[in-house]
């Protein structure tokens, strides 16, 4: 491609509304342009990158024998009403009516559509397992779209769906897709982790997220330094501590804590550390009006874990202070598990404390030297907390460390959630109708582009991994308009590299060298070749890698092979 014939529009200034590096650089390099809130046009430069992502994904999906199809973006409401998600999906579901007042949504995902297709197309166990995928535009009506295409309302996604009769078959396909995702991100040159994850609104029995590691990532990931264990903050757990094996010899004592309502205030007043206290949170129960969740004072409640407890109402709902005072006759800051007449669920870390400070269920009063069993009873012990850096890994191997990531892929073992709701069944080997079970495998195509930039950039611009770069090589002829030798050599190099299947940009614009070099760094082309009269006099071409500040001179007759070897490494 010749830059003079290409729509190459870059910006020096960073847009004011661009918060993170990928958003800033995608706008400055001319990859995207904003149309509206959370809506972006992919310009020619950005589309080249997007297509490279799609091609890698498509190649690896095809290797798993998944079959590509394309489903409608607009979906009838009846399908979503069958599964109950029309009511439960929430405000992110963009709904509409046609001229006949029939209701539809613009699909944020396609579980209902694919299940509807397969319940009509599949009749026998002999047709299973099957796996279908598409690369399709989705829409989620984000309340606050931000970070450019990282959290846009309209986005492109690869979603795949597999159908099975046995859990063993599902697990086999799940493993194949998991490995395909690893190959995809390896080929893209991205540093990532596959982590255990909560199934969330999609549902299912097991899932893994694929997280591209980046300091700007919104997700917290915990991983062991001595094993393969890794999970996101919602799912991560630590080695369960033993229950307190020593009894408290001190007598439980009631003390005044005037106007001390928070853990920090109580701990400071009593001259103790916050990890010597416990806190009691009151939430709505599934069968009881109120349930108490008890954690060590320095721990944070993991709301996803708490919601999974059978006694806790979903979604998690905290009881307001006025109702607590009316029902329990105790202000919120003084509640504790001693003689508390509602179900009590205690976190394992809190249960491991031989004694603790807790609210006394009287205003401005706390107990010191309280102990489990002797003074405080509980209904269940459960993992309720967010893990912390330095916690022991749950597999007993190593300690947990924390990093940030950007979720770019998510795979699920759905089970029969959708198939059962939509009566998707086939005749099994015994001649009986059996409900199918499903797998679901999502990968954010547009998000991968932004995540790659978050991981690969510097103060000058993007540093594309070779597999994703819009162009692999940039040839810059200096003063090519005035020097026939420079122009001729640049053209010769351009044609030779193209003949070897290399994506080449010939930047033949009539601009100053500084502008051409700055644009190359901003766009992030991995390999730069500069053709100048001075270098030609020495029989050389100047080479510079985007990852290095150093330049080197390469003999003219060796340049093509030099580039080919670099690209094929």
Swiss-Prot record:
It is found in: Cytoplasm. It catalyses: tRNA(Pro) + L-proline + ATP = L-prolyl-tRNA(Pro) + AMP + diphosphate. GO terms for biological process: prolyl-tRNA aminoacylation. Gene3D superfamilies: Anticodon-binding domain, Bira Bifunctional Protein, Domain 2, YbaK/aminoacyl-tRNA synthetase-associated domain. The keyword ATP-binding applies. Keywords: Aminoacyl-tRNA synthetase, ATP-binding, Cytoplasm, Ligase, Nucleotide-binding, Protein biosynthesis. It holds the Pfam family HGTP_anticodon. InterPro entries: aa-tRNA-synt_IIb, aa-tRNA-synth_II, aa-tRNA-synth_II/BPL/LPL, Anticodon-bd, Anticodon-bd_dom_sf, Pro-tRNA-ligase_IIa, Pro-tRNA-synth_IIa_bac-type, Pro-tRNA-Synthase_IIa_type1. One of its GO terms (cellular component) is cytosol. GO terms for molecular function: aminoacyl-tRNA deacylase activity; ATP binding; proline-tRNA ligase activity. Its EC number is 6.1.1.15. Its main location: cytoplasm. Homodimer. PANTHER family: MITOCHONDRIAL RIBOSOME PROTEIN L39/PROLYL-TRNA LIGASE FAMILY MEMBER (PTHR42753), PROLINE--TRNA LIGASE (PTHR42753:SF2). Belongs to the class-II aminoacyl-tRNA synthetase family. ProS type 1 subfamily. Catalyzes the attachment of proline to tRNA(Pro) in a two-step reaction: proline is first activated by ATP to form Pro-AMP and then transferred to the acceptor end of tRNA(Pro). As ProRS can inadvertently accommodate and process non-cognate amino acids such as alanine and cysteine, to avoid such errors it has two additional distinct editing activities against alanine. One activity is designated as 'pretransfer' editing and involves the tRNA(Pro)-independent hydrolysis of activated Ala-AMP. This is Proline--tRNA ligase. It comes from Legionella pneumophila (strain Lens).
């Amino acid at each position: 491609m010749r830059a003079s014939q290409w729509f190459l529009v870059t910006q020096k200034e960073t847009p004011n509304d661009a918060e993170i590096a990928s958003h800033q650089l995608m706008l400055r390099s001319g990859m995207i342009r904003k149309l509206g809130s959370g809506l972006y046009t992919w310009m020619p430069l950005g589309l080249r990158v997007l297509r490279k992502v799609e091609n890698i994904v498509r190649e690896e999906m095809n290797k798993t024998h998944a079959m590509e199809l394309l489903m409608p973006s607009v979906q009838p409401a009846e399908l979503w009403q069958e599964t109950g998600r029309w009511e439960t999906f929430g405000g992110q579901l963009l709904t509409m009516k046609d001229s006949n007042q029939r209701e539809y949504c613009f699909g944020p995902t396609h579980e209902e559509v694919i299940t509807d297709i397969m319940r009509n197309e599949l009749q026998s166990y002999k047709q299973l397992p099957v796996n279908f995928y598409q690369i399709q535009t989705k829409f989620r009506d984000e309340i606050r779209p931000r970070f450019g295409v990282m959290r846009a309302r309209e986005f492109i996604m690869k979603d795949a769906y597999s159908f099975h009769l046995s859990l063993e078959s599902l697990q086999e396909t799940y493993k194949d897709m998991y490995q395909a995702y690893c190959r995809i991100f390896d080929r893209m040159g991205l540093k990532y982790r596959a982590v255990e994850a909560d199934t969330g609104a999609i549902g299912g029995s097991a899932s893994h997220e694929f997280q591209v590691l980046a300091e700007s990532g919104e997700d917290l990931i915990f991983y062991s330094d001595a094993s393969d264990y890794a999970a996101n903050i919602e799912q991560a757990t630590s080695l369960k501590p033993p229950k307190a094996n020593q009894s408290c010899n001190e007598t439980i004592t009631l003390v005044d804590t005037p106007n001390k309502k928070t853990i920090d205030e109580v701990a400071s007043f009593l001259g103790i550390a916050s990890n010597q206290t416990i806190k009691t949170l009151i939430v709505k129960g599934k069968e009881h009006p109120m349930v108490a969740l008890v954690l060590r004072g320095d721990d944070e409640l993991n709301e996803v874990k708490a919601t999974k407890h059978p006694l806790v109402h979903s979604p998690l709902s905290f009881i307001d202070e006025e109702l607590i005072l009316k029902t329990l006759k105790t202000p919120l800051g003084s509640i504790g598990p001693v003689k508390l007449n509602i179900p009590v669920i205690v976190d394992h870390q809190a249960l491991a404390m031989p004694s603790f400070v807790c609210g006394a269920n009287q205003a401005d009063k706390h107990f010191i030297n309280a102990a489990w069993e002797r003074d405080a009873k509980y209904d269940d012990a459960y993992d309720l907390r967010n893990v912390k850096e330095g916690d022991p890994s749950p597999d007993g191997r190593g300690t947990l460390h924390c990093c940030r990531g950007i979720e770019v892929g998510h795979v699920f073992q759905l089970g029969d959630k959708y198939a059962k709701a939509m009566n998707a069944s086939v005749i099994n080997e015994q001649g009986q109708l059996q409900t199918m079970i499903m797998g679901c495998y999502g990968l954010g195509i547009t998000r991968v582009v932004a995540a790659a930039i978050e991981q690969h950039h510097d103060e000058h611009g993007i540093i594309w991994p070779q597999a994703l770069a819009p162009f692999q090589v940039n040839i810059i002829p200096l003063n090519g308009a005035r020097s026939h030798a420079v122009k001729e050599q640049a053209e010769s190099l351009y044609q030779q590299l193209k003949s070897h299947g290399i994506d080449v940009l010939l930047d033949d614009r009539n601009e100053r060298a500084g502008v051409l070099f700055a644009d190359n760094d901003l766009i992030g082309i991995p390999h730069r070749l500069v053709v100048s009269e001075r270098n030609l006099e020495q029989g050389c071409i100047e080479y510079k890698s985007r990852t290095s500040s150093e330049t080197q001179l390469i003999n003219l007759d060796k340049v093509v092979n030099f580039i080919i070897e670099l690209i094929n490494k």
